[in-house]
Amino acid sequence: TSLRPTTITAIPYYAWAHRAVGEMEVWIARDPSVAQTRAPPTIASTSRVSASHVWQADTPSALNDQLVPESSDDHAIPRHTWWDHRSTAEWLQYDFASPTKISSVEVYWFDDTGHGQCRVPQSWRLLSRDGDTWTPVENRDDYGVLKDQFNRIHFTPIETTAIRLEVQLQPTFSGGVLEWRVE
C-alpha cells in the first residue's frame, strides 16, 4: 500500500441532503496504519460458501473474506467453526459461478488452545465435483494441519464447478477455519 496526495471534493451536508435519497458514509483515515484497501476479487472470494454446520456466532463468509489472520487464535477477524460438533467429519464447500480451473488451495486453521475447545483438525482432504460425484484431487503435497500459517496443497490441475474440503475433527475437540484460498 502506498500513500499519495489526493484531491477530494467536500459537499456540505445541507447540499448533499437534497440531492437524492440514500445513506451518507464518509471516512477519511488520519492514520495510514488503520486504512485498508479492498483486495481484488479471487476465485475464493467470488465463490458461494456452504458448510456442514456453522456455530451461531460464526459465519461461513469468513472463509473467503480475504482477511489474513495474525495467528490461528485470531479473534479480531471473523471465523467459521463447527462448534459444538466434536470428533465429527465435517465439510466446507465453494461453488463457482462457472467451470473454473484450479491447481492449489491453502487453509488457515482456527485453534484456540488455552482458552477454548477448537483445534486444528486430525486430517483433511480436498474433493472436486464431477457431475453428481465428489472425487479426491490428486495432490502432490501432504495435507498440513499446522497452526499460525496457511497450509497449502498443490494438485493436478482440474476444471470444476465446486470443491469440498472434508475435515475429520480431533477426538473430543471441535475446529474451524479462518481463511480458505484457491488458485
Describe the function of each predicted region.
Residues 1-39, 73-183:
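Aromatic, loop-rich ligand-recognition surfaces of beta-strand-rich domains
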